[in-house]
């Protein structure tokens, strides 16, 4: 759903998604955030989601309302204090060859994400209630 408000750059989990190529409907590109000078590269949409979810887990924001079950005994990871190394303005300067999206996941409830995504080239902000809705937004805008 198209909204009229914009994403705050100053949320701890602000992510800039730069889409560099689209091959057979598969998106690939880079992810930028304030806690790393180097981008994280993804080759497909699943990697994009895994990298982002791992980032939210390390940041512990937004906190997930459910934990994934596993049959493998997990070691409890200690809380890692992340330090900002880039300003939000620096993160926002990066652009993708095919498209750029600012992502703000506000909640992680019902084993999914809820939040807003801003398509920079189209100057449109969308609200999404699930990862599936987010993927549909990215797909409809780019493919």
List where the protein language model places each region.
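Intrinsic disorder/low-complexity detector
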Residues: 1-17, 23-25, 52-111, 143
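Short aromatic-glycine-(Arg/Gly/Cys) micro-motifs in beta-strand/loop hairpins
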Residues: 20-36, 106-122
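Mixed-charge, glycine-accented linear interaction segment located at domain edges/termini
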Residues: 36-40, 50-57, 116-143
């Amino acid at each position: 759903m198209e909204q009229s408000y914009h994403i705050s750059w100053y949320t701890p989990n602000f992510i800039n998604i730069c889409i560099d190529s689209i091959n057979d409907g598969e998106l690939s590109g880079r992810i930028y955030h304030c806690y790393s000078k180097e981008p994280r590269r993804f080759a497909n949409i699943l990697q994009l989601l895994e990298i982002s979810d791992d980032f939210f887990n390390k940041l512990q924001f937004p906190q997930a309302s459910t934990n994934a079950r596993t049959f493998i005994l997990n070691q409890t990871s200690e809380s890692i204090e992340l330090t900002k190394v880039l300003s939000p303005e620096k993160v926002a300067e990066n652009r993708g060859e095919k498209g750029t999206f600012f992502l703000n996941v506000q909640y992680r409830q019902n084993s999914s994400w809820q939040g807003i995504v801003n398509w920079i080239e189209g100057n449109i902000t969308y609200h999404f209630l699930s990862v599936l809705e987010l993927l549909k937004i990215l797909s409809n805008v780019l493919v």
